[in-house]
Amino acid sequence: ASELRVNETASLRLTDIDSKRMMVRITQGKGGKDRYSILSQRVLEQLRQYWHKYRPREWLFEGAKKNDHITIHSIQLMFYAAKKRAGIRKPASVHTLRHSFATHLIEAGTSLHHVQMLLGHRSPVTTTVYLHVSRLNLAQVISPLDRTDKPIG
């Protein structure tokens, strides 16, 4: 669920992963709101492998301190290390993954309302920023006038 904010990812509990409904529960997201997000089958498989390897108990991503989750800083350090190993030089942060996820949803035709819900935005205006980032091919847009058999005029 790469649409999560870094603090939301850090504070995920094992019980927040609902593999039957393919959902992730985000508790106390920005503004203190709870919400649900989608869980990809590919991510679920990776989470299962991760669980079998590390056997976390309460927090999905356990921290160095006992009974605590991973820190935001640790996630950021892992991201930058992975970016370096991959040879990616373009500026990017953990938050870039969230922006990319939203942009891909919009490019795939997901409604702005659904993207807003997934990202946990209070206002649809906040979500519209992804419309400007999206590089939709205008040549692929079909005019509503071409969708009818009735003559015009």
Which residues does each PLM region occupy?
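C-terminal catalytic core of Y-nucleophile DNA break-rejoin enzymes
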Residues: 29-48, 59-80
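Catalytic tyrosine of NAD(P)H-dependent dehydrogenase/reductases that use a Tyr as the general acid/base
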Residues: 91-95
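C-terminal catalytic core of tyrosine-transesterase DNA break-rejoin enzymes
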Residues: 1, 98-122, 129
